[in-house]
Amino acid sequence: MSQTHFGFQQVDEREKAGKVAGVFHSVASKYDVMNDLMSGGMHRLWKMFTIAQAAVRPGYKVLDIAGGTGDLAKAFARQAGPTGEVWLTDINESMLRVGRDRLLDAGVLTPTCLCDAEHIPFPNAYFDVVTVAFGLRNMTHKDRALAEMRRVVKPGGKVMVLEFSKVWQPLEKAYDVYSFKVLPWLGSKVAGDAESYRYLAESIRMHPDQETLKQMMEQAGLDSVEYFNLTAGVVALHVGRRL
């Protein structure tokens, strides 16, 4: 029976998806507020950088995986315009519902899909850009998900992974205090849920570092993989291409 990690716990692979789903069902309604508090608003700048690097043009087809509350999909839909096609997807129904409603409130009409990134329900070589922001670390089989992203992106297209990463070494101790003391406290006070935010902190520590993720993307068949460290490596944006 194969094991994987759920935060710092070892669990059966078949259990992880359900446990992660429970976390995001719990945090969905407060997700944006908590992101602002946790990052001091920096998550908006990280996403803006990702949007700029994506360089979506009118007519592009874009897939946003684990798109959550729709920040990236909203920007991409406006850039792709009426001739483009932007899909907001998430494996979690609660998160997808929040994202869909926020897009509608912003006047953005774009399709949504309940989607497991390890089994993407789209044809080969369909999208110009595929993005996943703060979602890859929660996936049970990251290698399968990356291979699926590579499968559905067109030759010449980009696969982009925005994710928490390995912070600059001199900041590690302070970052640990923030992650394991302050973050669960914020989760308790603002969202009434310390445990979910403790899991989020643990999942960040268990996620591959910058070089390891680069190698995983290359092993998935992506070329010219590069990464950009943001905020001293708290977050990294990895970009790979299908040639």
UniProtKB/Swiss-Prot annotation:
GO biological process: aerobic respiration; menaquinone biosynthetic process; methylation
Binding residue positions for S-adenosyl-L-methionine: 69, 90, 116-117
EC number in record: 2.1.1.163, 2.1.1.201
Catalysed reactions listed for this entry: a 2-demethylmenaquinol + S-adenosyl-L-methionine = a menaquinol + S-adenosyl-L-homocysteine + H(+); a 2-methoxy-6-(all-trans-polyprenyl)benzene-1,4-diol + S-adenosyl-L-methionine = a 5-methoxy-2-methyl-3-(all-trans-polyprenyl)benzene-1,4-diol + S-adenosyl-L-homocysteine + H(+)
EC top class named in words: transferase
Presence of keyword Transferase: yes
Signal listed as a keyword: no
InterPro entries: SAM-dependent_MTases_sf, UbiE/COQ5_MeTrFase, UbiE/COQ5_MeTrFase_CS
CDD domains attached to this UniProt entry: AdoMet_MTases
Pathway(s) where this gene product acts: Quinol/quinone metabolism; menaquinone biosynthesis; menaquinol from 1,4-dihydroxy-2-naphthoate: step 2/2; Cofactor biosynthesis; ubiquinone biosynthesis
Coiled coil, from the record: none
Cross-referenced SUPFAM superfamilies: S-adenosyl-L-methionine-dependent methyltransferases
Keyword terms: Menaquinone biosynthesis, Methyltransferase, S-adenosyl-L-methionine, Transferase, Ubiquinone biosynthesis
PROSITE patterns per record: SAM_MT_UBIE, UBIE_1, UBIE_2
A GO MF label: 2-methoxy-6-polyprenyl-1,4-benzoquinol methyltransferase activity
Biological function: Methyltransferase required for the conversion of demethylmenaquinol (DMKH2) to menaquinol (MKH2) and the conversion of 2-polyprenyl-6-methoxy-1,4-benzoquinol (DDMQH2) to 2-polyprenyl-3-methyl-6-methoxy-1,4-benzoquinol (DMQH2).
Family classification: Belongs to the class I-like SAM-binding methyltransferase superfamily. MenG/UbiE family.
Name of protein: Ubiquinone/menaquinone biosynthesis C-methyltransferase UbiE
Gene behind this protein: ubiE
